[in-house]
Amino acid sequence: QGVAYAAKCYGCKATIVMPTTTPLIKVNRTKSYGADVVLYGDVYDEACAHAYELAEKHGYTFIHPFDDLTVATGQGTIAMEIFKELPLVEYILVPIGGGGLATGVSTLAKLLNPKIKVIGVEPAGANCMQASFKAGKVTTLPAVNTIADGTAVKTPGEKIFPYIQKNLDDII
């Protein structure tokens, strides 16, 4: 929805590819910003692969939702907001799907306070980052099973994984 909103603000056209299992409220909200929505695949990974194919075929700019350091950096500003509201915070729990949000938040949090503990949280049925974290390398789950569609990812981001390894203290 963020890309759709930004495209609307800048008068750009956006095509957003989402899994067929995406809740209708998210699909409708994305469309309300003027984006074209393509429903494809049963899980995020299939939708992402299709989005990349569309970008290649039509010359679109592909914006990865989590495996993009620029996107993760922007998401990291959440850590600044946390420290502004709670300057003595000792722990931050951050949700993980593909890892972009956790990368941004944990990286900036550790820069602002190297002693802070940042814990990633994933659904048990979609714990691709936890599996990767434990294995020391990006790992693909055979399947995902969660109602939390925003975290239903089989393979976490390759580009952001080193930041996860460096800046997350644990993943539960």
Question: Where are the model-predicted features located?
Answer:
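Active-site-proximal loop->helix
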Residues: 1-54, 108, 128-141, 160
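Glycine-rich phosphate/pyrophosphate-binding loop at beta-loop-alpha junctions
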Residues: 4-10, 67-167
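A structural micro-motif
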Residues: 12, 35, 58-60, 116, ...
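Short beta-strands and strand-loop turn motifs
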Residues: 33, 60-66, 144
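Acidic-enriched, low-complexity/disordered segments with a strong bias for Aspartate over Glutamate
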Residues: 36, 42-45, 67-68, 149, ...
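General beta-strand structural signal in soluble alpha/beta enzymes
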Residues: 39-40, 62-65, 94, 120-121, ...
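N-terminal small/polar loop signature for handling phosphorylated ligands or for N-terminal nucleophile
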Residues: 52-55, 81-83
